[in-house]
């Protein structure tokens, strides 16, 4: 019996340890098996952060084993007493270590993971789905409709061709992916609209393949899988063996061909469908992470992923021979080559249905049936040959050969990309090249930017103009002249005067747009569209009119064109500018929306690149658009290169600064600062209350959350990721999966974008998320951008106006929108290599920054920086970008978070907090994250950074949340109490047994 009792303490210890193991397993599953994107870098940092606790447990365990063995030399009952201390010590060590980890170094992560379960209410879900339906209904674009093939008659029997008809795309992959668990399939969407579908054809495709390959992966993410860009499609032999075409012809005379293309975070779209050997030789090894195709027939080096595959060509060719009424559904957010739509007389109609989200295929059914009249317009230019664009030779990434000194290691490979086309991106190139005679427009462009058809016809004209020399208001009269109700988009472009060899200018530039309500046949509406003269200014980065660079409105005639797309002018008003207006301090002062006059800030990012110029009819086109020949960092670039290896605090810190006050008791709470100006003295009093540890946590520990600070009444807040909707990273809570950003841009409907922003804020409030890592507004510089689905458009103005509406809707309702990725993150290949993005400042301001400028000036409170570099300087540590432009010029006050810290060799927190960043998107941060944590420079930088984050939070619904001890913490305290009672009782029992045994021994001896 005594031997059995010996095992009781060890059994109790084992049970308690097992309980901790179960909790740990639950935590692991939530973090690494759930929606939280945890990388190996996070895991490594977590192990480092927890290493003292791990070492402590190991040391105690070894010591306990030594004690147990050594106690064997002792006599009873002393041996039993000593050995009883071993399990007690082990259990105490585990308990203390677990508490130190979960209530200390990993508190913020654990707190987020074990947050109370919340959900979006049924009422809010319903309103969100209504908005999603409207976005899809207005964002689907009618590309072709010969012989009024659409809409189809009710009850039409449809043969759906293309494997994608059974596995269509709802969105992309990565942070902007869509939850498809409750999605309406393409087939169900058609059935809901009253169509019948050939079920035998559906079964044929289902049996061919059940899962769609994923074309991108996320490097360094736990459990990453090999990517696959295969376009699944049966061979013609497989079709014929199953008698598919014969049976389909017997079923119906109407065919619907569905073509899908995916995109996502991590990699860009293949420009050549080659085998891995060829790709490795060209791009330095990326092919080891994914396949271009697993179908041998589709290997074709002359084709890109955005063309029909060889198997698809064979299928389309056969369908068009068998059917005289073919409808095509293009299910892709990346602009594809669609010249084949014009090559077959049988193809009567085509629609673009990009990333429709969970409900968008219902909208597709409504459009094909005529219940909804399409009113979408393209957000990109569709060209016949994507391998003949100005960007194609300078997209992807090119390796430097002399980088190890500045990156810290030969393994930290430095890459670069040249934005050689300057301001001539998308339609701005094609319209200008046509005007200069460089291209035959109709042979190059298939569908212009802004293009979209309707089931009805409209008349529109500029009915009246108000022009006071500062702003222009157009009255655009619109009338539905057809026989179907529908909406109309009035697109306003301007053509500025261009002087050969002077400031670069495109021949067509979107400036504003508006959309009517639904107009019944014969009904009219007048749209008032207002913009300012300064909106037409060009940025003079070469100092032609202003020595240090400035926005310039040159004298001359400005043609204000009412258009149906970037190429088709319907009416014109000519605005005259009598003399140059130069928006700098030496001439006419800053633009009305700038806090200080814009001047050159990014000259270091121009590099030694030859940029495309309109001069002499694009005389330098061949030279400018050629692939880069120089693969060496210049001496200046090496000197400017920013990384952890080159960081020197002395370059940023004021040597005369004094240590800021910390830990003061001024009695202020964050809620007291709501609505208080950023530079109000009260902010200094509040910041004085923060301890160094508070400052460290607020700035370094920012992965999908903000830590709580009890002293100022700030409760911990969560942030959610993804432009397609609200998806908590810590629990299953989610709102509807909305159509992708491209589809929202294709609505050309700013009030609708604002409604989505308002709706997103409502959803976030219900699941306790104070921040949203969205919208994403990088530019479709190339159709091959992996995350184009997540970004709005090729146009900075369309992107900016859409984002401004969405962000203002969300911000006005208390949500912090972290607009991303700031800036020039227009591709995904090599983004984690600090890819040096070389561009001139005119293109930076007129194209890429324009998309961010408008939502920031509309009241945006958050920014997410990008992984790439601006020239040789990481965007997340670029003072010129984050301080000089964002804060000083645009007047931004708020939070600036980095993108995920997956490459710490250059994503250096020491640099970020000194240049305008406010927090790091990182987990498991140790005190070593900042060098010299308690120095004057670091504390001052952390204080300034915390100011921005707290200002944003003070003006969000985060301040309405009560500060309370989380339930899981209370549970931890309760478990600690139980363990303490057990340990004390255990020790008492051991001592009592020892005393009793000792007395018995003494009695025996007597």
PLM-predicted stretches and their roles:
Residues 1-543, 547, 551-561, 565-566, ...:
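Glycoside hydrolase catalytic-domain context in secreted enzymes
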Residues 568-591:
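Short beta-strand elements
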